[in-house]
Amino acid sequence: MAKQSMIARDVKRAKLADKFYAKREELKKIISDANSSDEHRWAAVLKLQTLPRDSSPSRQRNRCRQTGRPHGVLRKFGLSRIKVREAAMRGEIPGLKKASW
């Protein structure tokens, strides 16, 4: 089980990313727009830098929903490989079975 503080930190980052999503996208659009003036683009870059670091979606970590484990997480299930295996062995995931060939 991951430390509760690490899980809480990721939850906080997700909330910040949602809060600043629109503003961040607007600034990125200005920066990537070739028609805008250099001063306008530079002002957008500086404004983007003033936003909180944790508001960037790339700072979030995929974590297992049950254990909070940060590595070996399968996106399709939102669980770590260990928990997916346990659930599959108990037959809790429909259509998923152990491979045999």
From Swiss-Prot:
Biological process terms from the Gene Ontology for this record are:
translation
Q: Which UniProt keywords apply?
A: Ribonucleoprotein, Ribosomal protein, RNA-binding, rRNA-binding
Q: Name one Pfam family in it.
A: Ribosomal_S14
What is a GO molecular function of this protein? rRNA binding
Its GO CC terms are: cytoplasm; small ribosomal subunit
Instruction: State the source organism's domain of life.
Output: Bacteria
Query: Any idea what job this protein has?
Result: Binds 16S rRNA, required for the assembly of 30S particles and may also be responsible for determining the conformation of the 16S rRNA at the A site.
Checking HAMAP family in the record gives: Ribosomal_uS14_1 (MF_00537)
The family classification in the record reads:
Belongs to the universal ribosomal protein uS14 family.
PANTHER family in UniProt: 30S RIBOSOMAL PROTEIN S14, SMALL RIBOSOMAL SUBUNIT PROTEIN US14M
Please give the subunit comment from the record: Part of the 30S ribosomal subunit. Contacts proteins S3 and S10.
Protein name (database record): Small ribosomal subunit protein uS14
